[in-house]
UniProtKB/Swiss-Prot annotation:
Pfam families: Bac_luciferase. Disulfide bonds: none annotated. Heterodimer of two subunits, SnaA and SnaB. Keywords: Flavoprotein, FMN, Monooxygenase, Oxidoreductase. Catalyzes the oxidation of the proline residue of pristinamycin IIB (PIIB) to pristinamycin IIA (PIIA). It comes from the Bacteria. Its cofactor is FMN. This is Pristinamycin IIA synthase subunit B. InterPro entries: Diverse_substr_monoxygenases (IPR051260), Luciferase-like_dom (IPR011251), Luciferase-like_sf (IPR036661). The keyword Oxidoreductase applies. One of its GO terms (molecular function) is monooxygenase activity.
Length: 277
């Protein structure tokens, strides 16, 4: 196993979780070598004073340089167009350092979340990478042939498109899911059980698999079936930060400019580039 991927999960609940304490925790995780942090407000539902996850992600993008920022699921009733617009905008704000936890359900019996992911990915591809030319002399803002309608008609969603945001810096922000059911649609799969790792690798060989860190932070397992670990952080003074920062052979991934590069994930081609090549 190469140097494992490390993703911190951060509790953003209640009055103790101020913007200052959250910022300090994320910056401490960045200094300790974490590859990303999951800005998770799911446990904060109904807690007075909690932060909205996408707003918090945007704020953290302004005060960090290297660490990836994975935003928790948006409300279930959000339309795919709004989800794609918010997540694409966040990726632009963070210069390609974001991810989206599309679902925390371990099953998708109705296929709704799988369809949502497919539609959102399609909307991210509305503009080719070179669509915007900003040519003031010729009065040309974008190349019309580089704009694509989605025209999706499915069981749960009918979405025409196109999205009114340029293609994200990563092509697609990193898509994360929990559990094996949606692994084939994801880039990053968060599992609870190591026993699921082999089957996920078979159905989604392109994806990176993370398991909860099973023991002391200074002893990262070398024989794990996963590509890395999730680590729950309590704050900037969590002892796990010092232990991980001091570990021998700690990789330096600061040269990576996007979260995809940090995780070893390829930048996806646009579906339109693939069909017209």
């Amino acid at each position: 196993m190469t140097a494992p991927i490390l993703v911190a999960t951060l509790d953003t609940r209640g009055p103790a979780a101020t913007l200052g304490t959250i910022t300090r925790a994320v910056r401490a995780a960045e200094a300790a070598g974490f590859d990303a942090v999951l800005i998770d407000d799911r446990a904060a539902a109904g807690v007075q004073g909690r932060f909205e996850t996408t707003t918090l992600t945007a704020a953290l993008a302004a005060v960090t340089e290297h660490i990836g920022l994975i935003t928790a699921p948006l409300p279930a009733d959000q339309a795919p167009y709004h989800v794609s617009r918010i997540t694409a905008s966040l990726d632009h704000l963070a210069h390609g350092r974001t991810g989206w936890l599309a679902s925390t359900d371990t099953t998708d019996p109705e296929g709704r979340t799988g369809e949502l992911i497919d539609v959102v990915r399609g909307l991210w591809d509305s503009f080719d990478d070179d669509a915007f030319v900003h040519d003031r002399a010729d009065g040309l803002y974008w190349r019309l042939p580089a704009v694509h309608q989605l025209d999706h008609q499915g069981r749960h969603f009918d979405v025409a498109g196109p999205l009114n945001v340029a293609r994200p810096p990563q092509g697609h922000p990193v898509v994360a899911v929990t559990g094996p059911a949606l692994a084939a649609a994801a880039d990053l799969v968060l599992l609870d059980e190591a026993a699921d790792a082999a089957s996920v690798k078979q159905q989604a060989p392109h994806a990176k698999i993370l398991l909860p860190l099973p023991g002391p932070a200074a002893e990262l397992p070398a024989d794990s079936p996963a590509d890395g670990f999730t680590v729950a952080l309590t704050g900037s003074d969590d002892p796990v930060l010092a232990a991980l920062a001091a570990r021998p052979g700690r990789p330096d991934r600061t040269a990576a400019t996007t979260l995809r590069e940090r995780l070893g994930l390829a930048r996806p081609e646009s579906r339109h580039a693939l069909t017209t090549a």
